[in-house]
């Protein structure tokens, strides 16, 4: 990917290489002018995510019968993607009707195909999300809902590292310490939280649980970072059109999961409606709403804010699971919540003051190259100006001594 710099004297265009991971200029402008409306949107996003993310493990737990699922978890994920696709299509139709005179329609075949090519990167997070959504059900076989949410908070640390490597995001020293404190808080909650004397897949429960935890933390972290990267790199594209591509890829991957399940377990397992109840219908709607809300986080806010809002949802999940299912809130859980809240306060209150938009950081090499070009242009301007304002008999004399 490259850009051009035009000389103001000779109008020659010079190719300037840009960082491959650069965020779009449209998002750069958007982020540099954050208004009170944007802050209100962040509060609304966090509040909605706290409720939806807090309900998710509760609903999954309610769907279990005798400690097992009567339905295929992949079928829930597939129906969730279909629900989100329907929502995206409805919003696109509404948005298309509100186009002003002179605005380019985005539902034409040529525009749609061009947008599909530009947003092909969304297939990467869609694949990771398909794997992660299945892992959410598997994790419920090892931990209670409150513990699942605490384990999910480990994603913040992994996401921070991925953001620094992939999107060149900058963090202050205190922010890194806050993330380390978050890891300590989660570890406190895990002390003596695993059941003893049981096993699964032929492995001791601790080994199996920690193996799933590794995937449960890494896969969604990769999905979130690549989702933010894909959405912001095409910031001018309608978010509902981007969601349509993302959910379309997700539906394809989950359908492949259903086919693989049918091959392994037999054709009878291909019935996507088998074993579902009212609880699973609520779960599908909740997962769809949570996925739609997440896309607004990734495009208009950032991944770290999304994960910290999920951390706040831990309190809601812990209290709700204690009230509904009689799970005990141990002293470890209370201490862990306290540490996590302190960590979140430290992280949000110690951001880099002179932080510039990530796109400017990622295009630092291009700006440096442009500064060198501007020096040449300024020298050319000064010489041209001097030549223009020469008067008298010597106006045809050379600018430089012979």
Swiss-Prot record:
InterPro entries named among the record's database cross-references: Nuc_sug_transpt
Topology feature Lumenal, residues: 64-73, 140-146, 192-202, 265-280, 343-402
Entry keyword set: Golgi apparatus, Membrane, Sugar transport, Transmembrane, Transmembrane helix, Transport
UniProt organism field: Oryza sativa subsp. japonica
Recorded GO MF terms: pyrimidine nucleotide-sugar transmembrane transporter activity; transmembrane transporter activity
Stated name of the protein: CMP-sialic acid transporter 3
Primary localisation category: Golgi
Similarity remark: Belongs to the nucleotide-sugar transporter family. CMP-Sialate:CMP antiporter (TC 2.A.7.12) subfamily.
Membrane side Cytoplasmic: residue ranges: 1-42, 95-118, 168-170, 224-243, 302-321
Role noted for this protein: Sugar transporter involved in the transport of CMP-sialic acid from the cytoplasm into the Golgi. May transport important nucleotide sugars such as CMP-Kdo (2-keto-3-deoxy-D-manno-octulosonic acid) in physiological conditions.
Residue intervals passing through the bilayer: 43-63, 74-94, 119-139, 147-167, 171-191, 203-223, 244-264, 281-301, 322-342
Record flagged with keyword tRNA processing: no
Membrane topology: Multi-pass membrane protein
Compartment annotation: Golgi apparatus membrane
């Amino acid at each position: 990917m490259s850009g051009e710099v035009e000389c103001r004297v000779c109008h020659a265009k010079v190719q300037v290489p840009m960082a491959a991971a650069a965020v779009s200029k449209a998002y750069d402008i958007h982020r540099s002018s954050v208004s009170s409306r944007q802050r209100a949107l962040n509060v609304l996003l966090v509040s909605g995510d706290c409720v939806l993310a807090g309900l998710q493990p509760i609903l999954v737990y309610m769907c279990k019968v005798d400690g097992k699922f009567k339905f295929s978890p992949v079928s829930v994920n597939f129906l969730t993607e279909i629900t989100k696709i329907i929502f995206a299509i409805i919003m696109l139709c509404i948005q298309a009707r509100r186009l002003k005179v002179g605005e380019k329609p985005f539902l034409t075949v040529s525009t749609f195909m061009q947008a599909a090519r530009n947003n092909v990167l969304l297939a990467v997070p869609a694949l990771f999300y398909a794997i992660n959504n299945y892992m959410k059900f598997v994790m419920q076989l090892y931990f209670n809902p409150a513990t699942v949410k605490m384990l999910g908070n480990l994603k913040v640390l992994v996401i921070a590292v991925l953001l620094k490597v992939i999107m060149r995001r900058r963090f202050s020293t205190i922010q890194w310490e806050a993330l380390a404190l978050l890891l300590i808080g989660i570890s406190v909650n895990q002390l003596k939280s695993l059941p003893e004397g049981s096993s699964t897949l032929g492995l001791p429960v601790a080994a199996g649980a920690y193996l799933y935890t590794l995937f449960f933390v890494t896969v969604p972290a990769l999905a979130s970072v690549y989702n933010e990267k894909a959405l912001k790199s095409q910031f001018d594209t309608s978010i509902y059109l981007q969601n349509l591509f993302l959910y379309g890829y997700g539906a394809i991957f989950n359908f492949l999961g259903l086919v693989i399940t049918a091959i392994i377990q037999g054709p009878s397992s291909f019935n996507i409606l088998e074993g579902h109840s009212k609880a699973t219908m609520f779960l599908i709607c909740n997962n769809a709403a949570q996925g739609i809300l997440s896309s607004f986080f990734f495009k208009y806010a950032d991944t770290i804010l999304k994960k910290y809002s999920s951390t706040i949802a831990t309190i809601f999940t812990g209290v709700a699971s204690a009230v509904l299912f009689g799970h005990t809130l141990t002293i470890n859980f209370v201490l862990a919540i306290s540490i996590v809240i302190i960590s979140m306060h430290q992280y949000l209150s110690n951001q880099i003051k002179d932080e510039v938009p990530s796109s400017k950081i990622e295009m630092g090499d291009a700006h440096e190259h442009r500064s060198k070009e501007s020096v040449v242009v300024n020298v050319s301007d000064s010489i041209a100006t001097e030549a223009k304002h020469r008067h008298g008999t010597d106006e045809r004399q050379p600018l430089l001594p012979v």
